[in-house]
A protein has these predicted regions:
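Charged low-complexity stretches with an acidic bias
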Residues: 56-81
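Charged/polar positions within long, soluble alpha-helices
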Residues: 18-21, 46-54, 75, 79
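Charged, amphipathic alpha-helical oligomerization/scaffolding segments
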Residues: 8-11, 15, 40, 65, ...
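Amphipathic, hydrophobic secondary-structure cores in small proteins
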Residues: 27-35, 39, 45-60, 64
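N-terminal acidic leader/helix
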Residues: 2-32
Length: 81
C-alpha cells in the first residue's frame, strides 16, 4: 500500500475515533481499530471468533474490557451532546 493511502486511511480512522469517542490519539485509534475488526469478524465468521476466544481466554477478557471501555466512552460522549 502506498504511503499516501496509509495517511489517508489514518485520517479516516482518526476522524471515526473522534466521532465515536469524543477524542482521538494513537492509543484510542488502536483500540477502535481492534474493536472494529473484532466486531466485523464476530459478525462474518463467528466460529473463528469462538475458536479464538476458547484458545486465548486471557485475550478474550482483554477484548471484553476493550469493548466495555469503548461503549462507555461512546455513551459519555453522546450524553454530553
Amino acid at each position: 500500500m502506498s504511503e499516501k493511502f496509509n495517511e489517508q486511511f489514518d485520517g479516516l480512522l482518526e476522524k471515526y475515533t473522534e466521532l465515536l469517542l469524543g477524542e482521538s490519539n494513537e492509543e484510542r485509534k488502536e483500540q477502535v481499530q481492534k474493536w472494529a475488526l473484532y466486531s466485523y469478524i464476530a459478525k462474518t465468521m463467528p466460529a473463528s471468533v469462538k475458536h479464538w476466544n476458547e484458545t486465548y481466554p486471557d485475550a478474550k477478557e482483554e477484548m471484553v474490557q476493550l469493548i466495555t471501555d469503548i461503549k462507555r466512552l461512546n455513551e459519555e460522549k453522546r450524553n454530553e451532546q
